[in-house]
């Protein structure tokens, strides 16, 4: 096989591999997650004695932590800069919520938030 042909095969293989790497991100798409609204600092555990967990969430967010969603044993950091969404998350602190968005590892890019019924 000529050097040029090997280069073509390697380039084609690389393009195929790159395309396959994108498929999981495309397949993931928008999902709805139901869980408890928390913050990324405390996650599922609000252990400071005498502090209401909802107040703890709000205080941690005020100090710079991002909101989070606790789904079973998993804690997702919620990524949004939309003020209406942030206001809704503040209102739902330590309550059950439905969050719609796209998951990227442990982070959800939030599209919408609503109280879970």
Question: Which residues fall in each region the model found?
Answer:
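Conserved RNA-binding domains used in RNP assembly and mRNA/RNA metabolism
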Residues: 23-117
């Amino acid at each position: 096989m000529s050097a040029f042909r090997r280069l073509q095969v390697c380039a084609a293989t690389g393009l195929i591999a790159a395309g396959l790497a994108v498929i999981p991100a495309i397949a993931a798409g928008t999902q709805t997650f139901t869980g408890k609204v928390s913050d990324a600092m405390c996650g599922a555990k609000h252990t400071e004695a005498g502090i209401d967990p909802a107040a703890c969430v709000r205080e941690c967010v005020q100090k710079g932590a991002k909101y989070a969603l606790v789904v079973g044993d998993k804690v997702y950091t919620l990524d949004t800069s939309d003020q209406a969404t942030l206001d809704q998350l503040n209102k739902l602190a330590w309550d059950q919520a439905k969050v719609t968005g796209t998951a990227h590892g442990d982070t959800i890019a939030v599209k919408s938030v609503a109280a879970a019924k």
